[in-house]
Swiss-Prot record:
It comes from Malassezia globosa (strain ATCC MYA-4612 / CBS 7966) (Dandruff-associated fungus). Keywords: Nucleus, Repeat, WD repeat. This is WD repeat-containing protein JIP5. GO terms for cellular component: nucleolus. Residues 392-404 have a biased composition (Basic residues). PANTHER family: WD REPEAT-CONTAINING PROTEIN 55 (PTHR44019:SF20). Residues 172-192, 372-408 are annotated as: Disordered.
């Protein structure tokens, strides 16, 4: 199902409550829109007149424009009581999900436009910007009036835009090279003690691990991967990290082996991997700049097929809630895809009494799945795994999108006009 938007979308976020079927979208026009897709889960005859007469399985709850600059990120907090948004004018704004009114504002939160926002818990929120600065905030303490926003802490170890952030409630400590008893005891104590960490990927080709309790010294930065790191997800209950790159290679990281360098690599995508979502503990969904959403199995590595297609337009963002995946590309629509056929019963916490939603099923995309994972026809005899193309350095899709490799750039140049 496609949700029609008033302009091109840059980010999307599901309401965290399982009983609330709402999704927020940040637009290039500066608008933030909230949609209710609950009609997909109920008989159409029980729906309000608006959704029944329109023939749509969704309705727009509200639309606001807190800034005239593009909204580059949206994210609900864990309780769903706040919708945090970042804008090109360098501000952070908290909206009330009930009606969209502004609850709090952090003006001039960054020196350059923020590119990512991640609410961690009610007392902590992280943002990253186009210059590679990561900042931590207390959402409960916005500045008064038009006062300049002051972060709890600021990190400047990255030199290029922040592409993605992942919060790990526990990250395994690296294994000691010395197998003596003292090291084993120390590692055991570390494993028993919560090691929450913020994992950050950047366009400068490095991955960093931030201990928010460790001050400036609580930062570890990987070696230069000689490729832009664009997205990140965790599998194996946090034992492995998957990172998408500009060259289309998935780099695999093992925290217990240290995060100074990747532990494995899996080529196979003909274009950059701009978005990642965990499907289960062995499988991820990848959103690529060729417009395809692929299912990728890891350990052993295998491209399983395609579950979505944005018509050749790059996929900017993917978010998952239960058996639904929301994806946005370079267009004025948000696609909702039903993943229920891919998920075994009991893998996803959903209401058993609810019928299957009337969204695009994987079976409806049989003509896509029949193609190999790189988008070619299987009858051609080509392997699912392709070698990555020659390295080409791209600039950020948010602030430096001018050099990003997409199809028919000239025809879609207006997408980047207000970024």
């Amino acid at each position: 199902m496609d949700i029609a938007l008033s302009s091109d979308a840059l980010d999307v976020s599901f309401h965290p409550d399982e009983g609330v079927h709402q999704i927020a979208v940040g637009l290039i026009s500066g608008k933030v829109q909230l949609f209710d897709y609950g009609a997909m889960f109920h008989n159409q005859s029980t729906q309000p007149d608006e959704s029944r007469t329109s023939g749509k399985a969704y309705r727009r709850v509200w639309s606001v424009r807190p800034s005239h600059k593009s909204c580059r990120g949206v994210a609900f907090d864990a309780s769903g009581s706040n919708l945090f948004c970042i804008f090109k004018d360098k501000s952070i704004i908290a909206l009330d999900p009930s009606d969209g009114h502004v609850k709090a504002r952090w003006p001039r939160a960054h020196e350059s436009a923020p590119s990512r926002i991640l609410p961690i818990h009610e007392g902590l929120m992280a943002t990253g910007d186009d210059d590679g600065i990561v900042r931590l905030w207390d959402p409960r303490c916005p500045p008064e009036g038009d006062a300049e926003a002051k972060p709890l802490r600021s990190y400047d170890h990255h030199s290029d835009w922040i592409t993605d952030m992942l919060w790990c409630t526990h990250l395994d400590p690296p294994r000691s090279k010395k197998k003596d008893q003292e090291d084993d005891l120390k590692r055991k104590r570390d494993e028993e003690r919560a090691r929450s960490r913020l994992i950050v990927t950047s366009g400068d080709g490095t991955l960093s691990v931030i201990d928010i309790h460790g001050g400036k010294k609580g930062v570890e930065v990987s070696e230069d991967q000689e490729d832009e790191l664009l997205s990140i997800a965790s599998i194996k209950n946090g034992k492995k990290l998957v990172v998408g790159t500009q060259l289309g290679v998935l780099s695999l990281w093992a925290p217990d082996r240290g995060l100074l360098d990747h532990a494995d690599r899996f080529p196979g995508h003909p274009s950059s991997v701009d978005a990642l979502c965990t499907l289960d503990q062995d499988t991820v969904l990848t959103g690529s700049s060729d417009g395809l959403i692929r299912v990728v199995q890891l350990f052993p590595h295998k491209l399983l097929g395609i579950v979505g297609d944005h018509g050749g337009m790059p996929i900017e963002c993917m978010k998952r809630k239960g058996h639904l995946i929301a994806s946005i590309g370079h267009g004025n629509e948000c696609k909702l895809t039903d993943l229920a056929p891919l998920l075994e019963e009991g893998d996803v916490e959903t209401d058993a009494a609810e019928p299957e939603p009337a969204v695009m099923l994987v079976s409806d995309e049989a003509h896509l799945i029949a193609r190999s994972a790189d988008g070619s026809d299987e009858s051609a005899g080509e392997s699912d795994v392709m070698q990555p193309p020659p390295a080409t350095k791209r600039r950020t899709a948010k602030s430096k999108a001018g050099k990003k490799s997409v199809h028919d750039v000239d025809q879609h140049a207006s997408f980047f006009a207000d970024l």
